[in-house]
Amino acid sequence: MSHPSPQAKPSNPSNPRVFFDVDIGGERVGRIVLELFADIVPKTAENFRALCTGEKGIGPTTGKPLHFKGCPFHRIIKKFMIQGGDFSNQNGTGGESIYGEKFEDENFHYKHDKEGLLSMANAGSNTNGSQFFITTVPTPHLDGKHVVFGQVIKGMGVAKILENVEVKGEKPAKLCVIAECGELKEGDDWGIFPKDGSGDSHPDFPEDADVDLKDVDKILLISEDLKNIGNTFFKSQNWEMAIKKYTKVLRYVEGSRAAAEDADGAKLQPVALSCVLNIGACKLKMSDWQGAVDSCLEALEIDPSNTKALYRRAQGWQGLKEYDQALADLKKAQEIAPEDKAIQAELLKVKQKIKAQKDKEKAAYAKMFA
């Protein structure tokens, strides 16, 4: 029997839906919602569904709960896939299925022909356990070797963040973990909208929003709304939440720029620049000096003559005690805005710090050779 590829396959409402709430470095990133192809690979789908709920108790082979909760994504390869499911050893050497240690390849009806496909990891033919991977690009070389049994229907943005975490070899440098998981029944809230009391009514990732990303004017309205929410958090000195909202704006902007014509996408540059600058300001308030420098560099890549970016980067350099770098940025800012009093005052302060540093070094040398 032939079946359409997942690329062309519409979502089947009778198939099970499950979710992962993902944490990276102890911080919640978001939710991935997956459809399991129980209509085509029922045994494989049921294995994964039960591992999401934890309803099968303790595994006889591993002696560990048959449950993905607390399980890491232990292997990440950019432009390929993210892998997890080893709930026992947590490093790719363990895990087991709900049917026993291993079970057979059910079928290979579906091809690995798009991002966001859920497929069984294995150690050869008929060695399926609990380990799985989610593709981040088409991977046709895996066809006929790994069983495709589901797809991401919400939260591909979360999967992309996982794909891009820093790795040492193929191991994430930060712990990437399934903090919560389970099954979503008909009528359940899929949990893709924020519940932070801020009035934010937009999904955290633009891929999950019911909006045409090519509609730049609509994205601009959403971005301004989110920026205003971020500004409210900034005014209340909730720097972390402000950064989250400004970063969310940048996700929507980048999503729209990728989809829209270049001329239309240029309309989004001012709101993007404003949010990057605001992130830099938040990081200064948090004494995250390197983070502030990095954010201001990003702003200067958008607008090389932006005096706010130069001024704030100079403050970041001072926090890092890189006074010569700060001086260079402030001199450039003064060339652009010679009448700006704040730049003049900061320039004087940096010159005084450089003098104090040199005086201290002279005193130390004098003492050394006295």
Swiss-Prot record:
Q: How does it assemble?
A: Identified in ESR1 or NR3C1/GCR steroid receptor-chaperone complexes. Found in HSP90 chaperone complexes with kinase clients LCK or EIF2AK1. Two monomers associate with one HSP90 homodimer. Interacts with HSP90AA1. Interacts with HSP90AB1; PPID and FKBP4 compete for binding to HSP90AB1 and the interaction is mutually exclusive with the PPID:HSPA8 interaction. Interacts with HSPA8; PPID and STIP1 but not FKBP4 compete for binding to HSPA8 and the interaction is mutually exclusive with the PPID:HSP90AB1 interaction.
Biological process terms in GO annotation: apoptotic process; cellular response to UV-A; chaperone-mediated protein folding; lipid droplet organization; negative regulation of transcription by RNA polymerase II; positive regulation of apoptotic process; positive regulation of protein secretion; positive regulation of viral genome replication
Alphabetized Gene3D superfamilies for the sequence: Cyclophilin-like, Tetratricopeptide repeat domain
User: In which organism is this protein found?
Assistant: Bos taurus (Bovine)
Q: Is-annotated flag, keyword Transport? A: yes
Q: Which GO terms describe its cellular component?
A: cilium; cytoplasm; cytosol; nucleolus; nucleoplasm; nucleus
- Give a short account of its post-translational modification: The N-terminus is blocked.
Gene behind the chain: PPID
A single Gene Ontology MF term assigned here is: Hsp70 protein binding
Q: What does this protein do?
A: PPIase that catalyzes the cis-trans isomerization of proline imidic peptide bonds in oligopeptides and may therefore assist protein folding. Proposed to act as a co-chaperone in HSP90 complexes such as in unligated steroid receptors heterocomplexes. Different co-chaperones seem to compete for association with HSP90 thus establishing distinct HSP90-co-chaperone-receptor complexes with the potential to exert tissue-specific receptor activity control. May have a preference for estrogen receptor complexes and is not found in glucocorticoid receptor complexes.
Regulation acting on activity, per entry: Less sensitive to inhibition by cyclosporin A than is CYP-18.
What taxonomic ancestry is recorded? Eukaryota, Metazoa, Chordata, Craniata, Vertebrata
Identify the InterPro entries for this entry. Cyclophilin-like_dom_sf (IPR029000), Cyclophilin-type_PPIase_CS (IPR020892), Cyclophilin-type_PPIase_dom (IPR002130), TPR-like_helical_dom_sf (IPR011990), TPR_rpt (IPR019734)
Protein name as it appears in the record: Peptidyl-prolyl cis-trans isomerase D
Q: Which reaction does it catalyse?
A: [protein]-peptidylproline (omega=180) = [protein]-peptidylproline (omega=0)
Compartments reported by the entry: Cytoplasm; Nucleus, Nucleolus; Nucleus, Nucleoplasm
Family stated for the protein in its record: Belongs to the cyclophilin-type PPIase family. PPIase D subfamily.
Map the TPR repeats onto residue numbers: 223-256, 273-306, 307-340
Tell me which residues bear N6-acetyllysine: K171
State one Pfam family annotation. Pro_isomerase
UniProt cross-references to SMART domains, sorted A to Z: TPR
